[in-house]
Amino acid sequence: MKQRVLQFLHALTAHLNESDHAFVRRFLAEGERGLFYAMDVIDQRHALHTAYTALELAHKKTGVDEIFLVRIALLHDVGRVKGDLSLLGKVAVVLLNRFLPHFSRRHASLSRDGAFGFWRHALYVYYHHAEIGSEKLRLLGCSREASVVRLHHASPTAGDSMELQLLRQADSLN
């Protein structure tokens, strides 16, 4: 829970500076940048922190494709876009998942229709953003990135690539 409190505090002041934008331009092509910048600035900041942390972790390992690692770190949450969740909405969804996981999964919906449509959609995106982002990347022709993004919240397996393992670790630290 301490990590979630820190994430909330970071989100309150989330912004990107020119160095961050240059980093994104260095690693992502135009279409990929479109997906990155379609995210809320809070998610952009999180993705950048995840990428920077992943690079630090990679320096302690051998055989890591650091360019690919940075790319998947920057793109891992592109299934969430501006308007899906406000900061307070994210807090509410995290709390619902923590304390009422069966209820929140059962009521998650792609549709925004109905009295609670916004919240049902927010829950859906929370639970399925890896698959949503993976499909967006696949449509851009980024099949290798799509396959890793799809799995970044899945349970670890013995066959997971080093890059996927490092992404999960960096994501959990940010």
Model feature map: region roles:
Residues M1-L35, S155-P156, N174:
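Non-catalytic interface/linker regions that flank or bridge core catalytic/transmembrane domains
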Residues R33-N174:
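Divalent metal-dependent catalytic cores for phosphoryl transfer on phosphate-bearing substrates
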